Amino acid sequence: MQLNDLRSAPGARREKHRPGRGIGSGLGKTGGRGHKGQTSRSGGSIAPGFEGGQQPLHRRLPKFGFVSLKAMDRAEVRTSELNKLEGVVTLQALKDANLVGQHVQRVKVMLSGEVTRAVTLKGIAATKGARAAIEAAGGKFED
């Protein structure tokens, strides 16, 4: 016996449905779509959110909020991520280490995790907790 001789037991696999291939298949003529109507036609599906001509929910509700453009050029860095850097940490150093995107113009350090290295942050803002943690580890800030 070879691998190519192996066959499934009779009745183990169901034959796939082939709609519209005669009455003997059980899905002949209308192919399981029923008679007439939108969903019996080809391309008869309706778009998600369509409510039959009634004003859809997303247009009945009022607009609110906006997208801040400032969020596009600002970023946050965790204190634990500063352990990947050495010496003086600048905005360009963070970009080179892929900790912030290339479009970022301002960075703020947040307290999250431990600081194990003494780093000097140049031109980078920090929260009170992050500032205390960095200075406790022997780091300092320059403006």
UniProtKB/Swiss-Prot annotation:
Keywords: Ribonucleoprotein, Ribosomal protein, RNA-binding, rRNA-binding. Residues 1-58 are annotated as: Disordered. One of its GO terms (molecular function) is rRNA binding. The keyword RNA-binding applies. The keyword Ribosomal protein applies. GO terms for cellular component: cytosolic large ribosomal subunit. It comes from the Bacteria. Residues 21-31 have a biased composition (Gly residues). GO terms for biological process: translation. Coiled coil: none annotated. Part of the 50S ribosomal subunit. Belongs to the universal ribosomal protein uL15 family. Binds to the 23S rRNA. This is Large ribosomal subunit protein uL15.
